[in-house]
Amino acid sequence: MPSSREIKRRIRSVKNVAQITRAMEMVSASKMRRAQRNVLATRPYADRMREVMANLTARVVGAARRGTLLEKRETVKSVALLVVTPDRGLCGSLVANVLRRAGRFITEQRAMGRTVDVYTFGRKGRDFFLRTGFAPAGEATRLGDAPKLEAILGVAISAINGFQSGKYDELYIIYSEFINTLVQRPAIKQLLPVESPDISTTTNVDYTYEPGEEEVLNSILPRYVETQIYQAVLESIASEHSARMVAMRNATNNAKDLVRDLTLSFNKARQAAITKEVSEIASGAAALTS
């Protein structure tokens, strides 16, 4: 059984860890609320963009779609995958879930005879693919807790240009979708070719496009895809802070339980030491009187 001094040292160490995890929980809670506000702030723009896209894609059909981001290739030989992960860990199983889903997607695509290029947002995803010998075709790290659109444009434009040049036939993104504080799940979406938004959920507005529908569509399509990527990055950041807050709360609770168990062990060890000392005194006294 460990000595009282050793147990006391462990109790002090665990209490220090609990203070750190508690502080991290509070910081993550604050950052999560800010990340949620960022997600909500971009939704009106994203909703109006989807509305305009639904109206435009309903008007532009047939041959007019060729050579645009709406064009579906007859055969799919090459795919680009954008993987969004945090820069830091300590957020439960969030990173592992996203990377596991990405790995499964890559395996499925290769089984169909397709090549896959990976673009990463976040250090965790980049480091994972580098360790597995799968060097990303593009990467963006240190995006921060409130990244600007410009921070993701380099990778986004590179992937979009790959589709336009014919290098890729499809473009997908995998990220952690923010459901609520306790639930974040890996989500995969097809970015290119752009799928027409559901017009049943949009308002019935008769837009007039200048200089013309096709010109406006060709101009707005890249912005639409960039917005989808930016929204996914913001969702991933909100998910990261939510998962870290929950993970640190669990760590704090576990530390408290461990302190309670160690305190019980400390009391038992101290009681055993006192009993032993009393027994030795009694034995010594008995020896002197005999």
Swiss-Prot record:
PROSITE patterns: ATPASE_GAMMA. Keywords: ATP synthesis, Cell membrane, CF(1), Hydrogen ion transport, Ion transport, Membrane, Transport. It comes from the Bacteria. InterPro entries: ATP_synth_F1_ATPase_gsu, ATP_synth_F1_gsu, ATP_synth_F1_gsu_CS. Its main location: membrane. Produces ATP from ADP in the presence of a proton gradient across the membrane. The gamma chain is believed to be important in regulating ATPase activity and the flow of protons through the CF(0) complex. F-type ATPases have 2 components, CF(1) - the catalytic core - and CF(0) - the membrane proton channel. CF(1) has five subunits: alpha(3), beta(3), gamma(1), delta(1), epsilon(1). CF(0) has three main subunits: a, b and c. This is ATP synthase gamma chain. The gene is atpG.
